[in-house]
Amino acid sequence: MSNESKCPFHQTAGGGTTNRDWWPDQLNLRILHQHSSKSSPDPDFDYAKAFKSLDFQALKKDLTALMTDSQDWWPADFGHYGPLFIRMAWHSAGTYRIGDGRGGAGSGQQRFAPLNSWPDNVSLDKARRLLWPIKQKYGNKISWADLIVLTGNVALESMGFKTFGFSGGRADVWEPDEDVYWGSEKVWLGGDTRYGKDQLKAQAPGQGDLVAEPAKHGEEQNRDLSAERNLENPLAAVQMGLIYVNPEGPEGNPDPVASGKDIRETFGRMAMNDEETVALIAGGHAFGKTHGAGPADNVGPEPEAAGLELQGLGWANKFGTGKGGDAITSGLEVIWTSTPTKWSNEYLNNLFNFEWELTKSPAGAHQWRPKEGKGAGTVPDAHDPGKKHAPSMLTSDLALRFDPIYEPIARRFKDNPDQLADAFARAWYKLIHRDMGPLARYLGPEMPNEELLWQDPLPKADPSTIGEQDIAALKAKVLASGLSVGELVSTAWASASTFRGSDKRGGANGARLRLAPQKGWAANQGVDKVLAALEKIQGEFNNGGKKISLADLIVLAGTAAVEKAAKDAGYSGSVGFRPGRVDASEAQTDVESFAVLEPLADGFRNFSKARYSVKAEKLLLDKAQLLTLTAPELTVLVGGLRVLGANHGGSKLGVFTDKPGTLSNDFFRNLLDMSVEWKPTSADNETFEGRDRKTGQVKWSGSRVDLVFGSHAQLRALSEVYGSSDGADKFVRDFVAAWQKVMELDRFDLK
């Protein structure tokens, strides 16, 4: 008989079949409440203040010393951890994608699942452990998010490269992001769903490394893959668990030209142009090596699947010593140059000076070596001084030589090392700062003086601000302009709601609503009339000596309209407004870069540019999360914007009131009215009409975005709060607070 005591519980809290198991298509409001104060050990902690007290130079000195302080438990290649730390920083920042601004290095997500267990991040668990003594020493003065990126910068400097600069300000979070869509594949390195096909299978399911079984590599080498590769938006990686591309080539097919197409697609989705892409690859591969000393079946589970005794480390390797010269990371065994811990242009020299032939790594992965045995004995071994090798390349490296667009850029960099150094410094800086938002968020002594277009620069604010009397006079002029409450509110919303909490881009500051591309967006139909009227008011006011920006006036006009609507509903009081916004110029606006901010759907205005396979309510939820809204804020804003008449194009969908322009709780009262029966009016169930149950008379029309507030249990519960007889006051207060929040989302100068 077993001596083991029987547990009184079969399962513990949080286990068992969940609502998501029963209803996988259910609207997931949890993404609106992630990273709450309950997950933080210090909700009131001011990271910017703590960072300013950091001895920055002492930290850099410690990081520099770490680079060559090789540890027996994970020895440094070539006696230098620099290349490992460059990869760590790159893979932290490299998850960023322009489509929705999510991913990136901004919150230290590499510490958490799924990123800490991605196949492309093998051995980065060790890199972060090497950093722990330094993180421990400096404590909360440096976040993991900043430390990971700074360490990559210091690594470059320690190997002789002059970086462009570094800015801190990335505050840590304490749990994994739930809002980021990394793809729908269920196996590591799967890619079938993102390309809309079932042909690409996982290469090493469950192992968490890049290496396939040898027999599976290149089975379809001669197949033209170009017609099949239409990567799903907003993804910026070709397979589940990769940062960008498969280094062996598309689907393991060692075709450099096809690889070039994948590289262009994925790097482009991370906001890099062709020159920046070549510079990043050529600069990054000036250092270090890849690791594929043995077969993939030697590698154990990733960190999230590993045993407790491994203490958060994963990929335990039973090949030889499991480390150093026996390390297995990607399964590729490549050393690019003879100076892997020193900045040089040798990577490009080797790429063009040798002719290359296909070979395989010890793990069976496709890679390339110089033909006719050339280059032998010129490259050092990472751990054995008595060994020498020939240089080697990845399929993705050869893309820089054989892609017709990359080749002339790479050749120019080869012949002009100073151009490569400058381009790499700038591209690296962009890579590690792309998701930080405006310069007001940047901290530290190494922030460059040069203003860069991709940072969405703004002119300096006029130190003289308008006063309360000026604000009151401007409100009166706006309300006397003949513009409706709905027009003013909708225009202010169109300006402010481009903000994305993911990469801190967009928002009302800059008044880019009046510039290309925003002025031509379908979602902004009708704002030109409002802008013309506001520009006239602005001109008249500014001729009097004081100045107001159009950015401020757009928000102030919407605020005045909300105040009027509240007053018409019987509520007194003002809506908060803080001036200080500025107007960006066309020269400060990158049209192509801003194009990705275009709202293809905005449920807050009942707008959809087209019919999409994703349900409208899920697009609304995505928008709400990017606006950093909570579920109550989402609910009250939709209900308020509907009765204010802020719908796109004056649509009556969801306007459940007979007094539009008045800030009432009618949307909720009428949606929850059981005397109304709803039925779809379109075959795709996108629009509905509500009829009186007794008379059959049509009372209202609505969209999926409207009806979800009565259908979804959680949203209905919130709607009931605002639709109750005692909910009207709370509705107005909450709407005003949520409105001001959205109007100031990009005001980092106030935070």
UniProtKB/Swiss-Prot annotation:
Keyword Metal-binding applies: yes
GO biological process, one term: hydrogen peroxide catabolic process
Superkingdom to which the source organism belongs: Bacteria
Catalytic activity line of the entry: H2O2 + AH2 = A + 2 H2O; 2 H2O2 = O2 + 2 H2O
InterPro entries membership: Catalase_peroxidase (IPR000763), Haem_peroxidase (IPR002016), Haem_peroxidase_sf (IPR010255), Peroxidases_AS (IPR019794), Peroxidases_heam-ligand_BS (IPR019793)
Key words of the record: Heme, Hydrogen peroxide, Iron, Metal-binding, Oxidoreductase, Peroxidase
Record-stated family: Belongs to the peroxidase family. Peroxidase/catalase subfamily.
Function: Bifunctional enzyme with both catalase and broad-spectrum peroxidase activity.
Annotated protein name in UniProt: Catalase-peroxidase
